[in-house]
Amino acid sequence: MKIIRAKDYYDMSRKAANIISAQIIMKPNCVLGLATGSTPIGAYEQLVAWYEKGDLDFSQVTTINLDEYKGIPKEDSHSYYYFMNEKLFDKVNIRKENTYIPDGMEPDSAVACQNYDHIIHKLGGVDLQLLGLGHNGHIGFNEPGIAFEKETYCVNLSERTIKANMRFFAEEKDVPRQAYTMGIKSIMSAQKILVVVSGSDKAEIVKTAFFGPITPAVPASVLQLHNDVTVVADEAALSLLPD
């Protein structure tokens, strides 16, 4: 595992975007695994800026998103489909038919998960997987206690994750309780993994996940077993680690 220290959120975002852009330049038809949430937004903004300058071409890129809320239409502003289009896809020349996000409106969980696994396998896997890091160590929506052998599945979100997502909704009752997510096995099958972390509130979980024991109680700890993981984190998130 390689850890890159960034000065602040802006620096973290730029360093992460550099890694993603290098992947696109080296392999124009690459498969990128993408994440949502607040942490990756800065990296997406930087990628858009480089695209607008003519430095990046997304026309051959394929994307696979980690997760989607169950029961929310993709046109809803709270859906991850909406998020990805707003933050990235609508601003670059990626072909929409090459962007994949779990179908949150598929009522049959088994069908939704099987369909998504089929897409991932058909594409030959992910070249570079982008991840955020939850306060409880979740990656994607893989909550503490989840088995490492899972591929795509329907998850009941933890109370902590629901509370963390409340800031995006008008009321707590509106926050979805379930989501479709790529499992740990799917994430770990990526050729390369990039984790972005920012803020002093993530310092404890950075130390626990990346320097503590490997355990399902801390899903992100499994990343210690992957042979090509880069963590880009700002100084606040790394504040509990030795220099």
Where are these regions (language model features)?
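Short glycine-rich anion-binding loops that position phosphate/pyrophosphate groups of nucleotides
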Residues: S38-T39, Y69, L133-H138, P144, ...
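N-terminal glycine-/serine-/threonine-rich phosphate-binding loop
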Residues: M1-L32
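ATP/nucleoside-binding phosphotransfer catalytic cores, i.e., glycine-rich phosphate-binding loops
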Residues: K185, S189-D243
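Ligand-binding beta-strand-loop-alpha-helix segment within the catalytic cores
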Residues: L56-Q129
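Glycine-rich N-terminal segment of FAD-binding domains in flavoprotein oxidoreductases
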Residues: M26-E52
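Short beta-strand segments
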Residues: G33-G37, N65, P102-D103, L130-L133, ...
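A glycine- and small-aliphatic-rich helix-loop capping segment at beta-alpha/alpha-beta transitions
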Residues: E45-D57, Y80, P144-Y153, G212-I214
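Class I SAM-dependent methyltransferase SAM-binding "motif I" and its flanking Rossmann-like core
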Residues: N136, G140-I184
